[in-house]
Regions:
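Hydrophobic transmembrane alpha-helices and immediately adjacent juxtamembrane helices
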Residues: 1-270
């Protein structure tokens, strides 16, 4: 199989995801604009309350404007790195038996949904980016815009790990009929581990160093910290390395679960 054919096929899957999400425009508007706007507003109010309650001008060496900028960009990056819609679809394909139709086609299950995820995240990023951009300019919050390309590169690289974890969870549907619950538990854990809830450097040692070293910090804390001047480029390269290790380990587990599951699978779909 040539690379050109591989690229065209996956580009078609990505376009399919974009078109299918834009088909219901009101739903997409709520998903891409309203939801991140509300999330950002809640987190900003939270940090206002924290500083007012503490009666301090700085927390851990950073003033209120840095935490407001973190909340703005944090809600945006968290929206990109969160995956549940395609994870649910993958689980449903296996659980219902309709995966049979995918197994006989000239592409892998992983590839089919990964391309759709990336297409969906790409268009959602372009649309929802208006929210933090407008807010940052209105409130004049610290942001190093020249760092955006590298921050986005890390975020979309991290999406490979996100999808790989979703693939592992979906493969669990070969063995469990309540695997949907794992998705909810995983998303709650990542809410903390990515740094969406609060910056990871506010944690006490050694928990702080452990959480930052884990690949999940690449979801929110590292790109947002780098973008707002909280972190320097060395932490970004370390995060790239950590995500790479995570991708290798998780995909090895996923490949093993998938092969074993397919071998014993008895489908009921067409």
């Amino acid at each position: 199989m040539s690379f050109a054919a591989f690229w065209k096929r996956n580009l078609a899957f990505a376009k399919l995801a974009i078109l299918s999400n834009l088909e219901y425009r009101l739903n997409y508007f709520v998903d891409a604009i309203v939801q991140p706007t509300l999330t950002t507003g809640i987190e900003i109010l939270l940090w206002f309350a924290v500083f007012k309650g503490a009666g301090a001008t700085e927390i851990a060496g950073f003033g209120r404007e840095y935490y407001l900028a973190y909340a703005m960009w944090g809600a945006f990056f968290a929206r990109i790195c969160t995956s549940w819609m395609y994870e649910y679809r993958m689980i449903q394909e296996i659980d219902s038996g309709s995966i049979n139709s995918l197994l006989v086609r000239p592409m892998t299950f992983y590839e089919y949904y990964f391309s759709q995820l990336m297409g969906y995240k790409f268009i959602t990023t372009l649309v929802s980016m208006l929210v933090p951009f407008i807010a940052i300019f209105i409130f004049d919050l610290p942001t190093k815009f020249e760092r955006l390309p590298l921050a986005f590169a890390l975020e979309f690289y991290y999406l490979i790990l996100v999808h790989s974890i979703s693939f592992v969870i979906a493969a669990g549907a070969f063995y469990l009929n309540k695997v949907y619950a794992v998705t909810g538990a995983k998303n709650l854990a990542l809410w903390l581990m990515t740094g969406e809830l609060f910056p990871l450097d506010l944690m006490p040692e050694p928990l702080k160093s452990i959480m930052i070293a884990l690949p999940f910090s690449a979801g929110v804390y590292v790109p947002v910290g780098y973008l707002t001047g909280r972190l320097e480029i060395g932490t970004v390269w370390q995060s790239f390395a950590s995500v790479t290790v995570g991708i290798v380990v998780v995909n090895l587990i996923g490949a093993w679960l998938w092969r074993k599951g397919v071998n014993v699978y008895t489908g009921t779909g067409a």
